[in-house]
């Protein structure tokens, strides 16, 4: 699988130049440029996992190196600082992002040609969480969401996957297609979490299919997982 690691260069120095009354401004600018990056990424059929904001990842199977270069140039035009990128390859998203992350410390940004793989996207949703907000505090609900995020992250890490919190009670994961059965086995009898699985040629398609799967689970309340494949 192919993962593009993206690092914002001199990001900390940029934030420090904004003065002491800067946290609101940092959040405003971060959200503004991440909105633009999401828009650009969608045009190239990928999806940014924003993670730390100053470092983020993209699953880029199904995208040519020429397209990646155009995408990176488009992103650079919309960021307040420079960027450094590196393309990593691995049998799993976890391995690919590790290789891409190590590569960021090297001086060369050259992209090698790698074989494209199908992408398995996972859209997780917590059962009854919205209803539970009637009986708990906003902060306690957030703590539960965070604890589940940690548990899901650890599970996916063990099978070579990566995870992003989407907001609300939703999470987005990626695994290799070889690990899909492990996900099904884990959540087939789980009455707390449902997972929509999508398999596609690129990240955007896989995510769309995962969300389609999740909607089908919601319409069929007896199931905890469903899979759609391109």
Swiss-Prot record:
Q: Does the keyword GTP-binding apply?
A: yes
Q: Name one GO molecular function term.
A: GTP cyclohydrolase IIa activity
List the residue ranges forming a coiled coil, or say none: none
Protein's UniProt keywords contain Hydrolase? yes
Residues annotated as signal peptide: none
Annotated function: Catalyzes the formation of 2-amino-5-formylamino-6-ribofuranosylamino-4(3H)-pyrimidinone ribonucleotide monophosphate and inorganic phosphate from GTP. Also has an independent pyrophosphate phosphohydrolase activity.
State the name under which the record lists this protein: GTP cyclohydrolase III
Q: Which organism is it from?
A: Saccharolobus islandicus (strain M.14.25 / Kamchatka #1)
**Organismal lineage:** Archaea, Thermoproteota, Thermoprotei, Sulfolobales, Sulfolobaceae
What gene is behind this protein?
gch3
């Amino acid at each position: 699988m192919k993962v593009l690691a993206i690092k914002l260069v001199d990001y900390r120095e940029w934030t420090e130049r904004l003065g002491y009354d800067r946290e609101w401004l940092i959040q405003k600018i971060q959200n503004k440029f991440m909105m633009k990056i999401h828009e650009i990424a969608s045009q190239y059929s990928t999806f940014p996992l924003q993670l730390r904001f100053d470092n983020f990842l993209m699953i880029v199977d199904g995208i040519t190196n020429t397209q990646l270069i155009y995408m990176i140039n488009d992103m650079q035009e919309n960021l307040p600082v420079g960027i450094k990128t590196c393309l990593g390859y691995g049998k799993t998203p976890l391995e690919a992002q590790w290789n891409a992350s190590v590569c960021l410390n090297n001086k060369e940004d050259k992209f090698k040609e790698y074989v494209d793989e199908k992408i398995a996207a996972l859209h997780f949703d917590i059962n009854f969480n919205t209803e539970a907000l009637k009986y708990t505090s906003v902060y306690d609900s957030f703590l539960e969401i965070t604890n589940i995020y940690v548990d899901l992250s650890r599970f996916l890490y063990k099978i070579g996957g990566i995870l992003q919190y989407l907001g609300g009670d939703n999470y987005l994961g990626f695994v290799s297609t070889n690990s899909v059965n492990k996900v099904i086995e884990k959540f087939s009898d789980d009455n707390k979490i449902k997972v929509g699985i999508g398999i596609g040629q690129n990240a955007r398609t896989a995510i769309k299919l995962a969300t389609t799967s999740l909607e089908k689970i919601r319409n069929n309340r007896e199931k905890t997982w469903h899979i759609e494949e391109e």
